[in-house]
């Protein structure tokens, strides 16, 4: 999904999760990597409930699920969609920056930690990678 269409659906979710819940500064939540990225959005009864993006360089990011839909498979479905898209376009590896509370989730999907924990937007993160077939 292009950013032009995805923006209307993904922006409210990202604002709720990152800006309101996690106190990420609003001015850094949207960036110049949104337009060239592939966006995946999950729906329930035509309402957008989760989102994520795949950057041209193979990084997955901006994974955000509305609170009431967490731990119900929405994040896994979005992640699978993005991984499948990376495989279809021929990526050999994908990477992401996981917030520490989400490292176990990404491990279950084949991602491995690399390097040390670092801080981004005031939140501890762990770089992770996964090889693709």
Regions found by a protein language model. Give the residues of each.
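A short beta-loop-alpha structural element at the N-terminal edge
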Residues: 1-10
């Amino acid at each position: 999904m292009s950013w032009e269409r995805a923006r209307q659906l993904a922006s409210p979710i990202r604002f709720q999760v990152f800006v309101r819940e996690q106190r990420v500064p609003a001015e850094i939540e949207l960036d110049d990597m949104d337009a060239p990225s592939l966006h995946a959005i999950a729906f329930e009864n035509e309402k957008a409930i989760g989102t994520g993006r795949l950057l041209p360089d193979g990084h997955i990011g901006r994974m955000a699920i509305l609170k009431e839909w967490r731990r119900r498979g929405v994040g896994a479905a979005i992640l699978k969609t993005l991984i499948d898209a990376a495989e279809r376009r021929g990526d050999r590896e994908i990477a992401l920056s996981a917030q520490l509370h989400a490292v176990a989730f990404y491990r279950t999907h084949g991602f491995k930690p690399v390097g040390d924990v670092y801080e981004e937007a005031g939140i501890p993160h762990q770089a992770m990678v996964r090889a693709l077939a």
